[in-house]
Amino acid sequence: FQMYIRSEIVSLEIVIFFMPKPFHLAIPVDNLDRCNRFYSEILGCEAGRSSDHWTDYNLFGHQLVLHVDPHHNVKKHHNEVDGKSVPVPHFGVILGWEEFTSFAQRLTQKGVEFVIKPYLRFEGLPGEQMTLFFYDPAGNALEFKAFKNEDQIFAS
């Protein structure tokens, strides 16, 4: 009996060790109220701690912090990926296939203007994925994606 319990504990420790860790990302915004509405009402993120010049958000289990920078000026640059002009820099989350589909529908219903509309990228190739891009009200570019086979996230 003790051996069984110890085996389960070791297995749990291994699983916890290999689970992805949440990231923390702080981004500049020029108008905190406008961006707070976007991240909470449009993206559906839950707000955490806040002050008059920053707000924490739960972005699919990751900590995103909006920090006021009244002089924030986004330099827009694009690189070609799969024949599309991808905004750089950008950030986002890799979702499950079904979660991506419902999130893309939510964004469409909320009237988000896509830089790159949801589409299947690298079809039939390693790393096949659904992806979409849009800007938040401060001009920060976001990408959300879902891999057909999550084992191919780093496939080449």
Question: Can you say where each PLM-predicted feature lies in the sequence?
Answer:
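N-terminal beta-strand motif that seeds the catalytic metal site of vicinal oxygen chelate
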Residues: I9, I14-D33, H90-F91, L95, ...
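Vicinal oxygen chelate
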Residues: F18, P22-D30, N58, H78-S156
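A generic structural signal for short beta-strands and their flanking turns/coil linkers
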Residues: K21-F23, H53, H62, P87-P89, ...
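Core segments of cupin and vicinal oxygen chelate
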Residues: P28-H72
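A short local loop/turn or secondary-structure capping micro-motif enriched for an aromatic residue
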Residues: V65-L66, H72-K76, E150-I153
